[in-house]
């Protein structure tokens, strides 16, 4: 699914009206019907009172139409229309006239805000501003937003929380942005929803399809995407019944050091649970017996040292190589890693300590073989990219670095971003907070390694891996909850995740 800028969404709306054709008021009616159905499904029939706050623009028009439809559905509602300049958009004005024919009370707020008395079982519908807002809320709008945020009520935002910008908020005052519990967004997610700083505004958000023209959507170009299940399922071929293990690649995992065998085991198990035909693990002598006992399906080879990697393994036999989980940063390991990168001619995955070593000389990334992937968490990427901190800055830097080095970058976190060498960014839609646990990244490395070994290109491997990793995490969270979730639980859930995708 494409993610669009605000102006592009306006153009898609306009093109939809032209292509169907459909009048703007009728398109608004369709959107309002979809929103109302979602609201009634979640909150209707429970003696709830709906307090609807509408602005003077088209988002307010949606809210007024919702008020009318809630009355038709037998729900009790009241409207507060904020119109300090007595100037409504044409469609908002039309929906006001339609609402006046109903029994729903309407309060017009001018330049002064008078706080209404709302009942305790109140559902607030926020329809003050849409995604087109390009400046901070002020005046009576800001007063109303602060009032809404102070209410002991469930807050539902239409399309986007009022005061939140569709792309970036800059220095917007958080007090003047609605803190929604639920956001019902239309057709596409907004880029701002995917930024950590905005989670407190959007709450749990859901995408509602309002039937915008597929032709209009196709015409608009974007380098931003939100990955959904159907897209990933379409990328997974059925296994040939005449195939053998050699058809699914031979993966090499370089991992582990004294006291860090667990990282190698998690990555190895994830590799085998993700379809690699063969797996060899280069690990120090101290971990050899542990690994062969824990992962009997894997082969091991010496890493040239008792406690850590000292000698880079030859890579000619393998279809992909991953290095980093539990590797350590000893001087001999650093030297061996740099030699391994120099010698390797197949796609590589770099994670964890491999990235910590590379951070000392980030230009080494330019030496990685074509089709390689790195998987930094925000702290690791900050070290690689010279200290960039905000998610927006990291995404921009990762996009630039991926293009410069012709690699794929998996920028881990909520809505993990896959930054491809062609400048696209794919945000993941699976995963949960319970996955913020030791070894979770090692598990992801194993999944990526398996997919590269099986012959997927770097972008496809990264997109599939983060989706499956998150899906397995969601399955594990269903079984065990967020607090108790471990990386081993994620590995154990991988068969279920793959099975879901194979249906």
Language model: regions and residue ranges:
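Short, solvent-exposed loop/turn segments at secondary-structure boundaries
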Residues: 91, 136-138, 169-170, 385-389
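A structural motif corresponding to the C-terminal end of an alpha-helix
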Residues: 103, 150-153, 404-407
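Internal gly/pro-rich beta-alpha loop/helix module
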Residues: 121-123, 128-222
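N-terminal small/polar loop signature for handling phosphorylated ligands or for N-terminal nucleophile
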Residues: 65-149, 289-303, 310-313, 317
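Small-residue (G/A/S/T)-rich helix-start motifs and N-terminal tracts that mark the onset
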Residues: 1-83, 89, 182, 193-348, ...
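Short acidic loop-to-helix transition motifs that present clustered carboxylates
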Residues: 111-114, 160-166, 191, 306-308, ...
